[in-house]
Design a protein with these regions (language model features):
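N-terminal, charged low-complexity regulatory/assembly segments
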Residues: 1-136
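A broad, structure-centric signal for solvent-exposed, well-ordered loop/edge residues
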Residues: 23, 72, 170-173, 205, ...
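Preference for short coil/turn "hinge" residues that link or interrupt alpha-helices
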Residues: 57-58, 143, 148, 245, ...
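Hydrophobic packing positions characteristic
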Residues: 80-219, 223-228
Length: 278
């Protein structure tokens, strides 16, 4: 009885992802190139494709460690985290956490202290760059709501929004590395952290929250926030209703101007819709 499609797919993955071709070899017809060699070619090609995807997603990490070390690290990552999807733009989300426990990196303590943080930022940046676009929430719809209804709002964030908290100033390191600015890199104080970052791909909104009718019209926005503002924004973007988000912000910092922060987030186009608390 011939194998099912699912069995063929599982055999193929075991070989390509794990190097175990025992189940896949009998399924191949002999040719000028031996079946095991052909599968080896496919496996090497797939691995090279994934390594390249990581290089594109983590350019600053690669520059910090060098191409040779990065490729070795990437291949060690592949051994534990093979791709589960063909959508390579999202591949490597587990890479920052992998770096935190990667033994060869621990031999370089200063680098090990901030490299995973830079990777976490680049992961959020990569997500923002490839997230689907969504029109910003029309503020006129909110203006028409009764005040009591506003408290029940749960905002729907822009798909590109990401929140990153790092122990080191990852944003400063990231900018300095990508700009090849050695002076800026030397001036960085690793004890400056923790830092709280918001990442967003912004379309049609300028830095004052007005419609962007000139320039690129769309760009990556990276903002360092104080912790209270960051926690409030993250709560709103995680689906916490406005009433609860306001209460949480007041409990964390009684002096935090949550209403002002909400107006700023709305003007910056950080939400694309809303629903009401059930």
């Amino acid at each position: 009885m011939p194998p099912s499609l699912l069995e063929v797919q599982r055999a193929w993955r075991a070989g390509i992802a794990g190097g175990d071709f025992a189940a896949a070899l009998p399924l191949l017809v002999a040719d000028a190139i031996a079946p095991e060699d052909r599968l080896g070619i496919y496996r090497n090609t797939a691995a090279s494709t994934l390594v390249n995807a990581l290089q594109l997603a983590y350019p600053a990490v690669r520059k910090l460690v060098g191409g040779e070390f990065f490729e070795g690290t990437a291949r060690a990552f592949l051994a534990k985290h093979w791709a589960d999807t063909t959508w390579l733009d999202e591949y490597g989300e587990a890479f920052p956490d992998f770096l935190r426990t990667f033994e060869p990196l621990r031999a370089h303590p200063p680098l090990a202290a901030y490299l995973p943080d830079v990777a976490a930022l680049e992961c959020a940046v990569n997500h923002a760059l490839h997230a689907p676009d969504a029109p910003a929430l029309d503020l006129r719809t909110l203006a028409a709501l009764p005040p009591e209804e506003m408290q029940r709002l749960r905002f729907e964030p822009q798909p590109s929004i990401g929140f990153v908290r790092t122990a080191t100033p990852a944003d400063a390191i990231w900018n300095a590395v990508l700009a090849d600015d050695e002076d800026a890199m030397r001036a960085i104080d690793l004890d400056e952290g923790p830092v709280h970052l918001l990442v967003q791909w912004r379309i049609g909104v300028d830095d004052d929250g007005d419609a962007d009718e000139g320039g690129d019209g769309a760009r990556l926005h990276l903002e360092r926030m104080d912790e209270a503002r960051w926690r409030f924004a993250r709560a709103l973007c995680s689906g916490t209703c406005l009433r609860e988000a306001l209460a949480e912000s007041a409990a964390f910092d009684a002096d935090f101007a949550a209403e002002t922060a909400l107006a700023e987030h709305l003007a910056a186009g950080r939400f694309c819709g809303y629903r009401f608390e059930s």
